[in-house]
A protein has these predicted regions:
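Absolute protein N-terminus
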Residues: 1-2, 74
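C-terminal edge-of-domain segments
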Residues: 52-74
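N-terminal acidic leader/helix
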Residues: 2-25, 30
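Short, low-complexity, charged amphipathic interaction modules
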Residues: 26, 36-42, 61-63, 67-69
Length: 74
C-alpha cells in the first residue's frame, strides 16, 4: 500500500450542500458507522472511533468556527 501524501485543503460548499453533509455526518455518528466524504477529488473515510472537537478562532474582524474530526489510521 502506498503512503498517502500530506494534504491541507479547504472546500467551499453551498448552504444546501453543507447541510446535507452535516446531516449525513450526524446520521453516521448516531448509528456508530464510519462517515465517507469526498473532498477535492479524494474520498476520505472517517472511522466511528474518531475524536471530535469544535474550535473558535478570532483575528481582528474575522471569526471562524471549525468542527474537527481527528483519528489515526491503523
Amino acid at each position: 500500500m502506498s503512503e498517502k501524501r500530506d494534504r491541507d485543503v479547504e472546500k467551499i460548499y453551498s448552504t444546501s450542500e453543507f447541510v446535507s453533509k452535516l446531516r449525513r455526518l450526524a446520521d453516521a455518528l448516531e448509528t456508530g458507522e464510519r462517515f465517507e466524504i469526498q473532498v477535492s477529488g479524494e474520498r476520505v473515510y472517517v472511522p466511528a472511533r474518531a475524536e471530535f472537537n469544535i474550535e473558535h478562532e478570532r483575528e481582528g474582524d474575522e471569526e471562524e468556527i471549525e468542527f474537527q474530526l481527528k483519528w489515526t489510521n491503523q
